[in-house]
């Protein structure tokens, strides 16, 4: 499909720069294809679910993966920014470098505070390989837990570009840009639909008889990359590492066997569950990379509902929700959201989407 079909006008003031307080007081737009939109709030979510349903959360934890450093070559020094997006070994990460053209294979980069003599104040790396679109493989002088500690010391939370262009990252973001259930370190970006959940809301969901299950997809910086192709068939998704345990797969399959629904919290959970599901709809264990790219025409295998934030024009995530609930339905839903003051993007409001083909089946 043509990428420009997924374009729409989004006023700058619609982009949220801070999350709602409390988290679960963000607005929630309920979208059921063929029915009127419902304006709700996230704390009402238990009222929209049924006992026996299951919520699927992504428990990845955001690391401070934005590094600022200096590259020295032949006496010339230039500033380099790196956004780590995939760990490939104890001492190496794939990263997006800016400006990528200034960096060559073999270059040495020193990240952090150049005046410090302590390894926690600086972090050195070698550019081992260069790829496309500013991507490079960095091999660090530290590895394992020592590398993790150094990244935590010198790194910054990599706020999405549309927020970072408006304000600097601050200490508050280290809490705001993390779900309350995050536990598996490795993400560059938060699974933002999960940011709306509070411990109190999770308890109310359990009390309703709704199951909670966790998967892990380490969200990479590729989620921020714009779609530069004119047609969706020419866009290549960056892969991300994910895990679905045997126990979780069995539990979710049992939900369907009992007639319950699987509700993914966030597009990351959905992409992982759909990667792990076969054409028969059975979810199987998963451990590895996925680069699944969901656009209209995709036949969903396992996920019944999706809770997700409001996404940017021409983004792969708006393409995904258009595939899930219908192209025309989602354009209308976003028009409703914009005209009614919903807040967009990572710190914005949420939507609860029903699958278009499920809506037809139950109409």
UniProtKB/Swiss-Prot annotation:
Gene3D superfamilies: QueA-like (3.40.1780.10)
One biological process term in Gene Ontology: tRNA wobble guanine modification
Location of this chain's protein in the cell: Cytoplasm
E.C. numbers: 2.4.99.17
Alphabetic keyword roster: Cytoplasm, Queuosine biosynthesis, S-adenosyl-L-methionine, Transferase
Source organism, top-level taxon: Bacteria
NCBIfam families: PRK00147.1, queA
Annotated function: Transfers and isomerizes the ribose moiety from AdoMet to the 7-aminomethyl group of 7-deazaguanine (preQ1-tRNA) to give epoxyqueuosine (oQ-tRNA).
Name this protein carries in UniProt: S-adenosylmethionine:tRNA ribosyltransferase-isomerase
Gene name in the database record: queA
């Amino acid at each position: 499909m043509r990428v420009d079909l997924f374009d729409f006008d989004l006023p700058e003031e619609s982009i949220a720069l801070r999350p709602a307080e409390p988290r679960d007081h963000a607005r929630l737009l309920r979208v059921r294809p063929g029915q009127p939109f419902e304006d709700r709030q996230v704390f009402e979510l238990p009222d929209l679910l049924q006992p026996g349903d299951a919520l699927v959360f992504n428990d990845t934890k955001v690391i401070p993966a934005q590094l600022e450093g200096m590259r020295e070559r032949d006496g010339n020094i230039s500033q380099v920014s790196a956004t780590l997006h995939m760990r490939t070994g104890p001492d190496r990460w794939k990263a997006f470098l800016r400006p990528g053209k200034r960096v060559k294979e073999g270059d040495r980069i020193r990240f952090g505070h150049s005046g410090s003599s302590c390894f926690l104040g600086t972090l050195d790396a070698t550019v081992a390989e260069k790829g496309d679109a500013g991507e490079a493989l960095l091999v660090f002088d530290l590895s394992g837990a020592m590398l993790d500690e150094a990244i935590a010391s010198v790194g910054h939370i990599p706020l999405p570009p549309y927020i970072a262009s408006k304000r600097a990252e601050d200490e508050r973001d280290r809490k705001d840009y993390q779900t309350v259930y995050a536990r598996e370190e490795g993400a560059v970006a938060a699974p933002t639909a999960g940011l709306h959940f509070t411990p109190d809301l999770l308890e109310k969901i359990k009390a309703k008889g709704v199951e909670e299950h966790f998967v892990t997809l380490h969200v990479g910086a590729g989620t921020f990359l714009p779609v530069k192709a004119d047609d969706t068939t020419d866009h290549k998704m960056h892969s991300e590492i994910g895990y679905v345990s045997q126990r979780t797969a069995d539990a979710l399959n049992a939900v369907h066997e009992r007639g319950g629904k699987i509700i993914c919290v966030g597009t990351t959970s959905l992409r992982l569950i759909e990667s792990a599901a076969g054409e028969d709809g059975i979810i199987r264990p998963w451990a590895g990379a996925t680069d699944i790219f969901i656009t209209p025409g995709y036949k969903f295998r396992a996920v019944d509902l999706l809770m997700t934030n409001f996404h940017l024009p021409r983004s792969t995530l708006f393409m995904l929700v258009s595939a899930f609930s219908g192209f025309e339905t989602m354009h209308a839903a976003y028009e409703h959201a914009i005209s009614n003051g919903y807040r967009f993007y990572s710190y914005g409001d949420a939507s609860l989407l029903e699958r278009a083909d499920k809506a037809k089946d139950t109409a």
